Every structure is written in C-alpha cells, then in structure tokens.
Regions:
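Cytoplasmic loop-to-transmembrane helix junctions
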Residues: 4-7, 37, 95-102
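Cytoplasmic membrane-interface "Motif A"-like loop-to-helix N-cap segments
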Residues: 28-45
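A membrane-interface helix-boundary motif in multi-pass transporters
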Residues: 37-40, 119-137
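Transmembrane alpha-helices of Major Facilitator/SLC transporters
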Residues: 5-29
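Multi-pass alpha-helical transporter architecture, strongest
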Residues: 52-58, 133-157
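A late C-terminal transmembrane helix in Major Facilitator Superfamily
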Residues: 20, 88-125
Length: 157
C-alpha cells in the first residue's frame, strides 16, 4: 500500500491533467463546427472510463491497474473539462451558479453512494466485480447524455 497510494494518485492526477487539456482544446474546436461538439467530447471522456472500470475490476497485473488509472484519468479529465461549458449551453448566466452548485452536489451525493457500494462489495469479497458493474452505470449515463443533451447555442444568454 505504501507504493500503491502514491502511484495511483500520481497516475490519475497526471492523466487527468492531460485529459483536461486535450478535452478543452478538442471541445473548443469541435463546437465551432458542430453545436453538440462539447457534448460529444464529454461523451468520449466518459466512454474512456468504461474500459478503465473494467480493467480495475478484472485486471490482475500492475500494468492493467496503471492502464486503468491512465484511461480513467484522461477520460475523467476530458469529461470534467466540459461540464461547465456544456452547462453554459443550457443555462443562462444569471442562473449558472445555482445550476453548477446543484450539479456539483449531485456528484457529491453520487460519490457517497458509490463509496458505500464499494464498501459493501469489499466486505463481500466482490470489489472487482463491483468496479466492473459500475461501468454499466457509466454506460447508462453516457447514453442519457447523448440522447438528452441537444444544445441550440454555445452560450445561453
């Protein structure tokens, strides 16, 4: 554990930074050609977390775990870099603080629920399968994002 903590933290932090930069650049360019470019960019990021969760769940080697961390970090970075820009496509400036606060709080509640689930799966000896099952939830979120998020403008006034 003395090695696992720093290695996983550095891997995810570095790859998230890469994802944020790549996701921001891609999104800013894509939205100039397609109004849903930010949504698609966020979907790509979210999509990268699916194989990461599968690798975390079923990977049994150091390389698999590092690969999962890299995929998750890049994917989450791409996804996270686009949350506020996507929000701006749907919510006017006068309500963005409230909307972003609600969005963040929803994430905190979801994180708390997932932490509780992971604890139960750990106690039951099925943490790996639990991580893999989380990929199903991510796939559902990805499908919902692609189906429902249809912006009409890049910046709602």
């Amino acid at each position: 554990m003395a090695e696992a903590g720093p290695i996983s933290t550095i891997t995810i932090a570095f790859s998230s930074f890469v994802g944020v930069i790549l996701g921001g650049i891609l999104s800013d360019r894509w939205v100039q050609k397609n109004i849903r470019g930010r949504v698609y960019t966020g979907a790509i990021g979210l999509g990268l977390t699916v194989p990461a969760l599968m690798l975390l769940g079923f990977g049994s080697s150091f390389v698999a775990v590092i690969g999962a961390g890299l995929l998750f970090g890049i994917g989450f970075g791409i996804f996270d870099a686009n949350n506020m820009p996507i929000l701006c496509q749907f919510v006017s400036a006068k309500h963005r603080g409230t909307a972003y606060g609600i969005m963040n709080m929803t994430g905190v509640f979801a994180g708390a629920a997932v932490t509780q689930l992971l604890g139960k799966w750990t106690d039951g000896g099925s943490l790996g399968e639990g991580f893999a099952m989380l990929s199903i939830i991510v796939l559902i979120a990805l499908a919902l994002q692609l189906y429902f998020l249809r912006p009409k403008t890049d910046n709602m006034e």
